[in-house]
Each structure stands twice: as structure tokens, then as C-alpha cells.
Amino acid sequence: MAEQRPLTIALVAGETSGDILGAGLIRALKARIPNARFVGVAGPLMQAEGCEAWYEMEELAVMGIVEVLGRLRRLLHIRADLTRRFGELRPDVFVGIDAPDFNITLEGNLKKQGIKTIHYVSPSVWAWRQKRVFKIGRSTDLVLAFLPFEKAFYDKFNVPCRFIGHTMADAMPLDPDKGAARDRLGIPHSVRCLALLPGSRGAEVEMLSADFLKTAQLLRATYPDLQVVVPLVNAKRREQFERIKAETAPDMIVHMLDGQARDAMIASDAALLASGTAALECMLAKCPMVVGYRMKPFTFWLAKRLVKTDYVSLPNLLAGRELVKELLQDECEPQALAAALQPLLADGKTSHEMHETFRALHQQIRCNADEQAADAVLELAKQ
């Protein structure tokens, strides 16, 4: 009698965040089905969990139009090759992890061949280019969404979607230890502390750093002992920030950190940050915040017309109201930013209420996402 084939899951991750998700999913699946086989495009973490890498994840990790165009031929070749090889392999389920421009077309190709497909991490279709939802619906059997309002959006279009909670909410404690974070960063327990996070991209750091520094200078007038910490994602961004600081506030003492953004948020009484995942992480760190963001005028004009949501930051989208002050474009200037941060640093009613709401929102999206994703994969495999 022929030996029964083990459960076979094909996966494609296109960047580091996807590698983390893929590794967590593989771990949860292996705990239930130890002999399951995992193949596809994987980073080092997925490979460490036993995923066979037909291609290295770095092959897909290209950003920006110029880089994508330069690699387009190679990317199209990889996608065509994966379509063929997965078609021959006939995995029980294909899971495309994020990387929507690459994965959603691949999912569609495989679904046409009768292979069950999951897209893990919803693109921001609820915010802009909403018509993409129809292609996603045609290409996938199920979307796994991190956030409850994403599921509500897909439900409107009858696209199968499962809210699984957010892996970051699982990884972070409900009540972070502020004192321990300060000890790790060498910040005295008795002083007020402000974290500045001017973004992870070069363009953001260029646009925001000077105004963020001027804001901290204004706040120092009220709080002379204010400590300012600035976590920077890499050496390039640190160099860039140091140059801007030398031009803007050469005498101001700030503590620059290499990474350590999470510790900086937990240790701080308030944070000023660019929007993006940092705002969600800051919420989970229970650090009251103000979001400041600016882009080139034409980009902002275009975004205003394309973006369909009332807010840009995830805490506000989760709360369904302006929980966190958002100061965008012309409003993103030192006087306004300082005025918004002032009540948060005062450590009174405003920051306490924000802290409590952050905790409630954290509980709402803390659902053991790796396990839920594994449940979804196995349920689809059985159908």
C-alpha cells in the first residue's frame, strides 16, 4: 500500500516581517502535525523551523519602483516557476504571507489549478485602492486579518476573512515594566522622558526630524529635566538624524539608540512618532503618543483623494475615534506638536485615560494569532 503523503503546506514570504509570521505559523502547525512538510520562499527563521526554501526570501525583498523595475524580469520568472512547481506539487494549502503585489497574483494562478489559497496579512484595501478587494476575492479562499475592522471590510464584499488578532499583541505584555525598560536604557526613574520616532524610511527622517527636535526643545522649557530618547532603525538613519540634529539643535542633549524602539516606548512618558506600525507598537507599550506626519505636497494631495479612512494611525482606526492626536502636513509643526504632547507629559487625566483605552484595545487584538492561523490552515486543508 502506498504510504500516505504528509500534510504539505506551500508558503511564500517576501520580507523579514513575513518570515517572523511564517516561522510562528510553521511552529504552531508542527506542534499538531509533526511530520507536515513546508516548502516555498522562506527567510532564515522559516528555514530554521524546517521550511524547504526553493528561493531565498531576499529575492523578493525589493522596495521602491526603481528597484522593482530593475528586478522585474527576475520576479516574474520566480512567480512563473513557483506557479509551475506548486502546480506539480499540489500542496494541501498555499499561504501567501503579505507581499501582496507578488502573492495575490500567484494565489490566483494556483487557485485556478484547484489549489486552496490563503492570504496572510490583509493589504490596506480598507484605506485605499479598495477595488483590489475583488481581485483578492477571486484569488484566495481565505484572508487572515490582524485587525477587527479589516474583517468587517471584507464581510461587506462577501470575501471570506478570519480575524486572528495581531502577533505583536501576543508578544507584548498587557502591563509592560516601565522601570525595567528605564534600567536597560540607563534612564533615571525620577525624570520625565519623551521618545522621538521620526520614521524608518530616509524620506520620513528627512521630513520630520527637525520639527520633532524643535518640539522637544519647546517642551524642555516647561520640563527642564526632560530626557529625550531617539531610537533609530539602522546606522544609515542614525547618521542622517545626527546630521539634521547638528543643523537644528546642536547643543541639545538627546540619547540616540540603535534600534530598541520598544524599550524606548515602554520607558517613556510620551512619544512623538511618524504613523505606521510604530503607532501600534506604542499603543501596545502603553505609551501615550502624538502622531506627526508630513509628505511632499503632491503626495499629500494625492493621498487625501485616495485614502478612504478618517484616520491614519492604527490606534485611532481600532478605537473608531481620535484617541491619539494626529497632526498632518501643515499642522505638523513644533508649536502644535508641543501643545498636543504637553498634557501627556503632565501625567494627569489625559494620559491615564489613554493608557486604559490602550490596554482595552490590546486585549481586543490579543487572540493567539499563530494558533488561530494554524487552525485556519488545517480547517481549509480538510475541506
UniProtKB/Swiss-Prot annotation:
Gene Ontology BP term (one): lipid A biosynthetic process
InterPro entries given in the database record: Glyco_trans_19
Keywords for this protein: Glycosyltransferase, Lipid A biosynthesis, Lipid biosynthesis, Lipid metabolism, Transferase
Reactions that this protein is recorded to catalyse: 2-N,3-O-bis[(3R)-3-hydroxytetradecanoyl]-alpha-D-glucosaminyl 1-phosphate + UDP-2-N,3-O-bis[(3R)-3-hydroxytetradecanoyl]-alpha-D-glucosamine = lipid A disaccharide (E. coli) + UDP + H(+); a lipid X + a UDP-2-N,3-O-bis[(3R)-3-hydroxyacyl]-alpha-D-glucosamine = a lipid A disaccharide + UDP + H(+)
Entry EC no(s): 2.4.1.182
Function: Condensation of UDP-2,3-diacylglucosamine and 2,3-diacylglucosamine-1-phosphate to form lipid A disaccharide, a precursor of lipid A, a phosphorylated glycolipid that anchors the lipopolysaccharide to the outer membrane of the cell.
Protein name: Lipid-A-disaccharide synthase
Organism: Klebsiella pneumoniae subsp. pneumoniae (strain ATCC 700721 / MGH 78578)
Taxonomic lineage from the root: Bacteria, Pseudomonadati, Pseudomonadota, Gammaproteobacteria, Enterobacterales
